[in-house]
């Protein structure tokens, strides 16, 4: 945290992270001075921001107490209204979060070693899976989805084409029908 020299009456921005930024990450006419990597307001621009208590004083002590309590609650309510509220999550956001959680669970599950009552069989199975020459075949839909996500241009059609060895592979550019590759 950068501690800046603040004005003599301490109304300035140099005492903490929240107030130090002054709400400005960009240069404006209100925040003309660059400090480290953010802009702060010029000298004296934050003067007069504090509110004076407006509790009316009466002869009745009960009314004074009621007024003082009411003033505190309204100030607290105003402060709560000024606070930034968290946006209500839409159904799409909730679905995206659920998708991320399930993907994380799947990744964690994949790393776990399956255990049975026979520890020797567990070790043998783990070694076999680690040294298997052909990894387990992924489904065609997962392969196609992977190809689609790698492409930064957005969603595109996926065509299945046979390569030289005769295996079907997903491609995003449509081959010519005259060549007879499309299967």
From Swiss-Prot:
Plays a role in the inhibition of host immune response within the nucleus. Interacts with cellular nucleosomes and immobilizes the host immune danger signal HMGB1 on chromatin. In turn, prevents HMGB1 release out of the cell and thus decreases inflammation. Also plays a role in the wrapping and condensation of the viral DNA. May also promote viral genome import into the nucleus. This is Pre-histone-like nucleoprotein. The modification Phosphoserine is found at residue 165. Residues 2-23 form a propeptide. Induction: Expressed in the late phase of the viral replicative cycle. A motif (Nuclear localization signal) lies at residues 168-183. GO terms for molecular function: DNA binding. Belongs to the adenoviridae histone-like nucleoprotein family. Cleaved near the N-terminus by the viral protease during virion maturation to form the mature protein. GO terms for cellular component: host cell; host cell nucleolus; viral capsid. Interacts with the core-capsid bridging protein; this interaction bridges the virus core to the capsid. Interacts with host NPM1; this interaction might play a role in placing the pre-histone-like nucleoprotein on the viral DNA or regulating viral gene expression. Interacts with host HMGB1; this interaction inhibits host immune response. GO terms for biological process: symbiont entry into host cell; viral penetration into host nucleus. Keywords: DNA-binding, Host nucleus, Host-virus interaction, Late protein, Phosphoprotein, Viral penetration into host nucleus, Virion, Virus entry into host cell. All late proteins expressed from the major late promoter are produced by alternative splicing and alternative polyadenylation of the same gene giving rise to non-overlapping ORFs. A leader sequence is present in the N-terminus of all these mRNAs and is recognized by the viral shutoff protein to provide expression although conventional translation via ribosome scanning from the cap has been shut off in the host cell. The record marks 23-24 as: Cleavage.
